Amino acid sequence: MVVALVYAFDTCLDRIHLLKKYYTSKGFDVVSVTSNFSHRKKAVYQAKADVVIPVREYHKNLSADRILSHIEFSKKARKAMEDIQPDLIHCIIPCNTLVKEMAKYKKKHHNVKVMYDIIDLWPESMPIDRYKGLLPFKIWKNNRDKYLSSGDVVFCECELFKKYVHCGSVLYWAIDRECLPMNPDLSEDELQFCYLGSINNIIDIPMITAFLRECSIKKKCVLHIIGNGENKEHFIQEVLCVGVNVVDHKEVYDPVQKQEIFDQCNYGFNVMKPSVVVGLTMKSLDYMCAGLPIINTIQGDTKDFCEEWNIGLNLNKGNIKEMANIVCLESMDVQLQRRKNIQNLYNTYFTTKHFNATLSEALKRIYGG
């Protein structure tokens, strides 16, 4: 049997790696279909896939070129299905127009099974509240919602997304490696925080700096940064302005080196603008695997995990001072227990074993057995 993995962007390669590994282990012939354009770098790149579709380039997240590029990829991906003739299509969403085009393909080829795997909500997850009600954005959203019923299975990457698309089951992300042992090296007299990931337009820099300002009143504070992004220099300057030192590690890929940084830190920041609809972030999985508790503003799944599993603190505009006081005054025993809690959470929901089991249940629903 042939499974086609269809994905437009390079932002989901970790998930694609897990899917390829799973389907290959189940005896499927896997054919990967993607574009030649890096959404992350906004440039053409050498994609490692069986079918690479050339598409229009774009340089802004909100642009006509971006929409036209998505439409072009989706239509060409449907044509690629005619050549591949897959038994199963596992389609990563966004882009939203892929749902429409795969629905057209399924209407013509009744025997094919289709899985839609929603890993982001466009336009809901974009920090553009004042525009989301406009007609172009409604059409963009409807390209997904109107055709989801054509899927035999609809996955969402988190419980929060299910509330928006009104269907589906959760396929949480996983990290395809063993978590390293924790060796916390914390000080009673100093607080160290970590920011991991891209520093872009959806990060709530004012929230982070306001929190750090309050913490620095009571204790010396240090922020470790692992990552880059268009707003990085601005972020660093804002943090320095509130009296907090910054250690810029740039991009770190070595798990051992990353773990050593996490072991120095009391908390990791998982903070985005309130208009962004996200229930779980990849950075939070890295924090979980490393045993690093979080300062969190993400709604849905992560907020609930913080409350139910005691893995960190939920931050909002109204409780910045209160949360800073808690962090500054809490005992080392409380912090160490949170480190155990967050790694236990990871081992419960976010391992490859759990990821594969969820996929197996879906295949049973489709094919029986």
Task: Place the predicted regions along the sequence by residue.
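A charged, aromatic-enriched C-terminal amphipathic alpha-helix characteristic of glycosyltransferases
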Residues: 318-324, 332-366
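Conserved donor-binding/catalytic core segment of Leloir-type glycosyltransferases
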Residues: 155, 185-203, 208-213, 223-224
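Carbohydrate-associated surface elements
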Residues: 160, 173-174
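An aromatic- and histidine-rich active-site surface loop
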Residues: 13, 39-40, 70-74, 86-110, ...
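Nucleotide-sugar-dependent
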Residues: 203, 254-261, 266-288, 295-305
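N-terminal subdomain of nucleotide-sugar transferases
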Residues: 1-51, 153, 210-218
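Membrane-proximal helix-turn-helix segments that form the acceptor-binding/catalytic region
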Residues: 75-78, 97-100, 104-108, 122-124, ...
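Nucleotide-activated donor-binding/catalytic signature segment of Leloir-type glycosyltransferases, i.e.
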Residues: 233-260, 264
